[in-house]
Structure formats: C-alpha cells, structure tokens
Amino acid sequence: MYFKRKAYDKLLEWKKLYSEKYAVLLEGARRVGKSTIAENFAKNEYRSYILIDFSKTTSNILECFDDIGNLNIFFLRLQAETGITLYEHESLIIFDEVQLFPKARQAIKHLVHDGRYSYLETGSLISIKKNVKDILIPSEEMKLEVYPMDYEEFCDATGNNYGLLQQIYDSGAAIGQATNRKLMRDLRIYMAVGGMPQAVEAYVNGKNFSEIDMVKRQIISLYEEDFKKIDASGRISALYHAIPAHLAKDARKYRITTAIGKRNNTKAEELLYELIDSKTVLPCYNSTNPRVSLTDTKDFDSYKLYLSDTGLFVTLMFIDRPVTENDIYAKLLSDKLPANLGYLYENLVAQMITVSGRELYYHTWEKKGSTHYYEVDFLISEESKINAFEVKSSGSGKHESIREFCRKFSQNISKAYLISQKDAGKEENLLLEPFYLLPFLIK
C-alpha cells in the first residue's frame, strides 16, 4: 500500500531544479518509507530506472563499482546485469540502503558530473562513523529528510479531512466542545498508531490495536538490532528505552548516567550522538538566553530526548509487557489512562515541530528563593522574536512557567501559547490552542 507523502513533492522539485548537478539522498530512520517513496517516484517520473538495493544485491552488481574510471563500461555492465535499458536524461538510478556500500556513495561525484542520468540514494544510519570513515562524502549530494508520516499525511491515508482543520484555524474562533472532543479523539488515534507506514497500513486494513502494537514492536526490535551493531554492549538501546521514563519524571534534562550508569563520559557522549544520528530520536536543547538567539545559545550539555514517532513512544511506554492490550489503547483514545500523560503530548508536539523543519529548543531557569525551576517546553523563532509553547494534557492549572517567561522576556516574545486538549481561546496574553491546530501555528 502506498501513501501520499510530502517527500514526493520535494523530489519533484529536486528533479526540476537540481537533478542535473546533484544526486538526492533520502535520509531518515529505518522503516519511515524512504525506499517506497523512491521507487514510486522512479516509476512515475522517469522512462526507466535501475534499483540497486545494497541489502540484497548480487556480487556481480557490486563488482561494477570496483572501477568506475570508464563510465561507459560501468553503465553497460549495469544494464546487462539488470536487463534494464537506460535512456540519457530520462532514467534514474537508485542506490537503496547506500550506507551498506559506501563505495557507491563515493562514486556519486563522478556519476553526477557525467550528466547522463539522475541519481537517488536512500540511507539510514547514514552519518554513523563506521559508514563514512573510509570515503570522501560527495558535495554533489542534496539531503532530504524523511520523517514518519505527519498528521496531514495520516489524515490523507485514513480519509480524514485535514483541510477542515485549516479552515478552523483560519476562522480564529472556538469550534465548540463537542466538535473539539471529536477532533481530539481523531488526533489520539494518530498518537496511538503513529506515523510509521507499516503501522498506518495495519490500521487502514482494520487491524486491532494489539496487532498494530506488534507491528510497532517489530520496528523497535529492528532499531535495537541496529543499535547493537553500533555498540554491542546494548548501551545505545538502554539510552533509547530510557526516554519515556526521563520525560515522565519531568526532569530538566536527559541524564545519560541514569540510563547506562556512570561510564567514560567521552564514550557515553559518542553513543548519544550515534543514537541521534540514527534519526530515531529528537534532541531538544536548552537555550540559555532566548533574548540573543536560540541557535547561538544552545547548551549541548542540557537537552531532552523525544522519540521521532509518537506511536512508537506509546509502545515503548508499555514495552515491559508482551503486547500492549487493546484495553490500554481504548483508554488512551478516550483519554482515561490513569497516568498523567503530559509527556506523551510533549512528544507529539516535538514531532510536529520537527517535521516543520525546525530544531527543538526549550528554556529552564532557577526560581528565585527556591530549589525549583521554571521551564517552558518549546521555543521557536519567528523573524526577530520567539514564540513560546507550554504543553498541558488537560489545559488546567496555573501555567506559572510560561507566564513568568512572558514577564522575563516581554521584549522578545511574539506569541505565547498554551497547547492542550481544550478548545481555542485566550487567557490574558496567553493564547490557548488545541493540539490538532499546532501544525498551523508553526508553518
């Protein structure tokens, strides 16, 4: 089953504007749909294409790359081995899972300069040290990030009218409690299923939530296998599994030692960066002084980690049992889980901000005369100012942190939002918006 993906539109732009001078690399975590997008693009937009999947190709194909000094012979061998005819300026060559054969990635420089065909690569763990240590990274390569399906893509796949949300946002008015509850339930389905195409396909095909959960567990197992290939000790996997617990504690930052114990700091940091490079997690950095610049005041020692897919986050929350039962999902969909799930909604917001093309930032500072801290969950730049976001699963409470932030940085703030399950509204200078309208706030 193929779903409409935004990355496809970006590939169309690449083909029209850049394909003569650059290859394009679809980069992202495993199982986000890179290979499917690539092959559908090739089928629809080119006269012919050759797909080389380096996870299962033949030794004869690999031997073609031993000598690319004579590209005429190289292309003849490829056509002979695959039985596919290439047409100049009308054919695409796909290097799928290119991280498994770095020599092919290095060849991109010469292939692009040759100019006869277009080139598309897909890769996961593409930046991991062992996958790039012996090659020259080609400058003739444009990177295109592929994420799990966002809420708009999910609505398109499931037949929900995402355009209606745009109209609600444009109206600037509250929609009413009954409709708001319905729209929040729709969003919670997305949170429960997530955006991994295999999980979405299972949902579209009518599978129950326990069956969908098994699909997501298989993806997590695949990630764990990848982590062990990078570090056999299992510490990267421990860092990954610790994310829900860290967020549940409402800690001001992620602590590596809590997940893997006290180890060599340098080695632990290397493992952390390998985890981040896998694209399975989203780092959110503390901006020490939002007055100046979020990027320039990024504290690399103070950060939080979120999962790149909220559906996987739900499964990881209950990974201690053999399968997450339908009953748990039913309670999640009806908002009746006994736990405070503010951190689950935080992960949703982190994912939504990331797919908009932005980095994640938060801000925390000491409360005078107290051992407690204020914290604003997310900050984004808007021209020369910033927008601040506080995330609440319920919407009730004093919202002390964001109000104090507004006082402290009044000259630097454009808008301050409370994102919750409640309908749109306003409390003094605080704008109240439901989660399903967040994508329109950060466009």
Question: Which role does the model predict for each range below?
Answer:
Residues Y2-Y18:
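Pre-Walker A adenine-sensing motif
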Residues L26:
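Hydrophobic anchor at the beta1->P-loop junction of P-loop NTPases
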Residues K34:
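Conserved lysine of the Walker
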Residues K56-H89:
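Short glycine-rich substrate-engagement loop in P-loop NTPases that contacts/grips substrate
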Residues I94, S118-S124, E145:
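Structural recognition of the conserved hydrophobic beta-strand(s) that form the central parallel beta-sheet
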Residues H110, S127-K143, C155-N160:
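Short regulatory helix/loop adjacent to the ATP-binding pocket of P-loop NTPases
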